[in-house]
Swiss-Prot record:
Enzyme Commission numbers on file: 3.2.1.21
Function: Beta-glucosidases are one of a number of cellulolytic enzymes involved in the degradation of cellulosic biomass. Catalyzes the last step releasing glucose from the inhibitory cellobiose.
Compartment list: Secreted
Region feature Disordered, mapped onto this chain: 730-754
Extent of the signal sequence: 1-19
Name of the protein described by the UniProt record: Probable beta-glucosidase A
Keywords assigned by UniProt, alphabetized: Carbohydrate metabolism, Cellulose degradation, Glycoprotein, Glycosidase, Hydrolase, Polysaccharide degradation, Secreted, Signal
Active site residues per record: D281
Matching SUPFAM superfamilies: (Trans)glycosidases (SSF51445), Beta-D-glucan exohydrolase, C-terminal domain (SSF52279)
Catalytic reactions on record: Hydrolysis of terminal, non-reducing beta-D-glucosyl residues with release of beta-D-glucose
Pfam families referenced in this protein's UniProt entry, alphabetically: Fn3-like, Glyco_hydro_3, Glyco_hydro_3_C
Entry's Gene Ontology molecular function annotations: beta-glucosidase activity
Similarity-based family: Belongs to the glycosyl hydrolase 3 family.
Amino acid sequence: MKLGWIEVAALAAASVVSAKDDLAYSPPFYPSPWADGQGEWAEVYKRAVDIVSQMTLTEKVNLTTGTGWQLERCVGQTGSVPRLNIPSLCLQDSPLGIRFSDYNSAFPAGVNVAATWDKTLAYLRGQAMGEEFSDKGIDVQLGPAAGPLGAHPDGGRNWEGFSPDPALTGVLFAETIKGIQDAGVIATAKHYIMNEQEHFRQQPEAAGYGFNVSDSLSSNVDDKTMHELYLWPFADAVRAGVGAVMCSYNQINNSYGCENSETLNKLLKAELGFQGFVMSDWTAHHSGVGAALAGLDMSMPGDVTFDSGTSFWGANLTVGVLNGTIPQWRVDDMAVRIMAAYYKVGRDTKYTPPNFSSWTRDEYGFAHNHVSEGAYERVNEFVDVQRDHADLIRRIGAQSTVLLKNKGALPLSRKEKLVALLGEDAGSNSWGANGCDDRGCDNGTLAMAWGSGTANFPYLVTPEQAIQNEVLQGRGNVFAVTDSWALDKIAAAARQASVSLVFVNSDSGEGYLSVDGNEGDRNNITLWKNGDNVVKTAANNCNNTVVIIHSVGPVLIDEWYDHPNVTGILWAGLPGQESGNSIADVLYGRVNPGAKSPFTWGKTRESYGSPLVKDANNGNGAPQSDFTQGVFIDYRHFDKFNETPIYEFGYGLSYTTFELSDLHVQPLNASRYTPTSGMTEAAKNFGEIGDASEYVYPEGLERIHEFIYPWINSTDLKASSDDSNYGWEDSKYIPEGATDGSAQPRLPASGGAGGNPGLYEDLFRVSVKVKNTGNVAGDEVPQLYVSLGGPNEPKVVLRKFERIHLAPSQEAVWTTTLTRRDLANWDVSAQDWTVTPYPKTIYVGNSSRKLPLQASLPKAQ
């Protein structure tokens, strides 16, 4: 059949992906599975089919394609279907609040949510964000993130996600999604998948940094590691009913993430049973037909490059369907998936047009900002959507603060005669809290890292402000030195202080911004802004020095953590707008710290393994990142190589003490696991496709410059394609089976949301007594780890946890269950999960290396 030039581009990446035999290869999987409305999607699927059946081809295409960068109010907007009262969908960053807006909250980052180990707080944060997005007229929140997972401790965007542990991430990822969608907004699980570093994630971005590479980095991963580590939290997201998944910039095994048929068609749609829609990351769309057949459902922001006025889809998708290159059922499936997600969250009952503009804070402006066209209208209504969310933000900030060391220094009493506040991180950014675009600097206290995963602060309470308020209420004295290079002034203040509170940080972010020479990823994992010298100077002059770390992840503290005058260390992460109040609540004992570290604190960067790829290592070809570490990242790596961390994964102190006892295991009457078999139904067409004359630009339409439309210029499809190569035969670019709409075999590991339903069947019930043995109320997090027993398996892997609040001397019984999935490994040969015959042992404790309770499990099927 025939297609336009734009569709041909990069088609080879959809099937045969490696020009060199020695490079990783992503096997093809076709056709793209069509939604079937399984499980809780049944009702909304029927509604979606009904409405899509009434649409014309161009109306369907309009749903799939963004209108172009900066051409509507949101960072991404689809076309609309006015005839059927379907509005343009507004898609907006970020995972921690509304980007490019005003009168919105700036929530703690995902890494802080991970540190709470609190499912309820994850849900409440998601719900609060969803409420704000909805109130601003946003239909799709571009978050939360579980990619990157955190294979590299210095990866630039780890903080947007949760933890390098897939189970901890998966649970909190799912709870966040539920919260967002219960508020009536479609959540987006991103960045799918293996988007583990910023260097080379986009070829044009790499070129801007002086690298001569032809393609984006390829994350090369084996099947077992993919399933047991990186895909794990996305299975939880699908099981939670997520409406959208965003495919990533990078390649996976040398096939781009947004046209990788293995990851989109096979893993996400066929195996995990994802019923929602896949959108591209912004300009991560590299081909027309190739991406469509490989499982992409929505192109964002619609144009090939920002403001190019050209699109892989839009009119080109219309041409592809009309000339038979793309089967009708594929574009119908795209539209059904989008509408099903829209109905699933009840967006049709909560819809309101966007009441803000991403591109200006002025009240009035052009409807189409970038080209200064359309009506000159009110584009910002300044709607305050914050509600009472500041209280929740403050609570999460405090409950995510990890107490790493306490030699009697904390909590403070307000009776300290003189408090010294030391370090730039205690103070404010002299340019203002939002003084750097997308937070692309490290000035003052760090409460949010940089990139598109940010939001504007409505205000930012600094540690200096909050702690000074505490001290003055106690009629004490406070000196602040917030110049981290003024070591003589820091020493002088520390010598006089009853307690020195030292604030230090380490920042990172997205690769399009470079901060102090850090191109998204961190150059190292040391403290920024002379932090180590600030700590040592204070500790050498004050015998009661407490260090507070605001960071995106682990930092090296080996130089000073065991200094005798360092009496306390706290990690406060990226706590958002209430930063100062949150840390003051912990320092002064209003909140008893109960957080646990969501990552390992190593003595050196080398102790983590998993180095970033920072140099072009494949000539001018795509840089290759080989994930040869397999499942051994973070604490799993430390355990395997007998590396002793400073503070282990799951570690965190309290102002009280706890005791765990009485571990009991009860086998449950579970059925035998049955691999899924049989066939799907055949693909269906919804509605009729007319001839080309029905899809030509309407007469009298006043076109907006660079706007992406679904209509074609002419009934002559070759002319509409503007392609000298129009007329290629299918065999040259269409992968085998890619257009086959007949019934397809079901995968053994498929069958329900998140995979085979048998994976989620409970095999054992486990109970443990938890007692507060101290004198103050506090929170403990019992953690259950499993040894899977095999010779090449991690020593232990986290599977269950719960944050429990207990009064002094109070005792509670924590009960949980272990599913088949919790005990299974991925069998590469069978392409299914299996509980191996190796002995299984469970361990319960309060960190990955403090596991006093253990029990062997009976053999399970």
